[in-house]
Regions:
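N-terminal hydrophobic or amphipathic helices/low-complexity stretches enriched
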Residues: 1-31, 73
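Glycine/charged-rich beta-loop-alpha catalytic/anionic-binding loops adjacent to active sites
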Residues: 80-93
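Active-site nucleophile and cofactor-binding loops and adjacent substrate-binding regions
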Residues: 62-63, 92-100
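Short coil/turn connectors at secondary-structure junctions
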Residues: 56, 77-82
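Short coil/turn segments at secondary-structure junctions
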Residues: 6, 32-37, 90-93
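General structural feature for long, well-ordered alpha-helical segments within catalytic domains
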Residues: 11-18, 41, 45-49, 80
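A non-catalytic alpha/beta surface segment that caps or lines the substrate-entry region
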Residues: 28-73
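Alpha-helical metal-binding/catalytic segments enriched in His/Glu/Asp
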Residues: 22, 84, 96-108
Length: 108
């Protein structure tokens, strides 16, 4: 059995590029972002996240409130799931990594 984290692999270049791609949606002041909930920019960010999830082999669920749940099966069907949560939208003057770093870190 592998030690915890031994098989954890993060592609730093892909993570960085994904962050920068998302940052192009709704550019804000001083290098931040403005992807407020239910705006066109929020929808564009959600669409891009869906595309990345599809490429990673995830299935997607969306609840009545619009929360997205990306699910990827693990290699051990008896193992407990791992949950990671954050948000893709931002405050009006949100930072470039506001929420999205947690989302993409989980996907990575």
């Amino acid at each position: 059995m592998a030690a915890p984290g031994e098989n954890l692999k993060i592609n730093g270049d892909r993570l960085w590029n994904s962050l920068m791609d998302m940052a192009e949606i709704g550019p804000g002041v001083a290098g931040g972002n403005n992807r407020q909930t239910l705006t066109d920019e929020d929808g564009e960010g959600r669409h891009l996240f869906q595309k990345w999830c599809d490429a990673a082999g995830c299935s997607m669920g969306v609840d009545q409130m619009g929360n997205m749940f990306a699910m990827r099966p693990g290699t051990d069907p008896d193992a407990l799931p791992v949950y990671v949560g954050s948000h893709l939208d931002t405050q009006p003057t949100g930072g470039k990594y506001d929420g999205v770093l947690g989302v993409l870190g989980g996907l990575e």
